[in-house]
């Protein structure tokens, strides 16, 4: 499982111009079951994505297709962790 912290490196006006395409990117990967949570940070200087069920190299390939990455609007910091406990109702595979 991964926590992806996105930090904007461009002015919000430029980020906002790419926001619709970024949301479409998120939607595609929610539908594929890779992203399980996402949203803006407070204050709005970036965002956070939680991803699961994918190898790190594949995740890196996916993140490279984000319009924010393609337009060099943000930096991505990826932290992998082993979830050993999940809230009731989250039906995600836990690592062995």
Q: Which residues are covered by each model-predicted region?
A:
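Conserved, structured core segments of small domains
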Residues: 1-96
């Amino acid at each position: 499982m991964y926590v992806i912290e996105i930090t904007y490196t461009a002015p919000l006006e430029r980020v906002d111009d790419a926001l619709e395409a970024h949301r479409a990117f998120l939607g595609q990967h929610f539908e594929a079951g890779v992203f399980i949570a996402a949203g803006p940070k407070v204050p709005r200087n970036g965002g956070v994505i939680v991803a699961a069920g994918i190898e790190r190299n594949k995740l890196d390939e996916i993140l490279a297709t984000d319009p924010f990455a393609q337009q060099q609007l943000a930096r991505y910091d990826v932290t992998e962790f082993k979830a050993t406990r999940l809230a009731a109702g989250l039906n995600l595979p836990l690592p062995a």
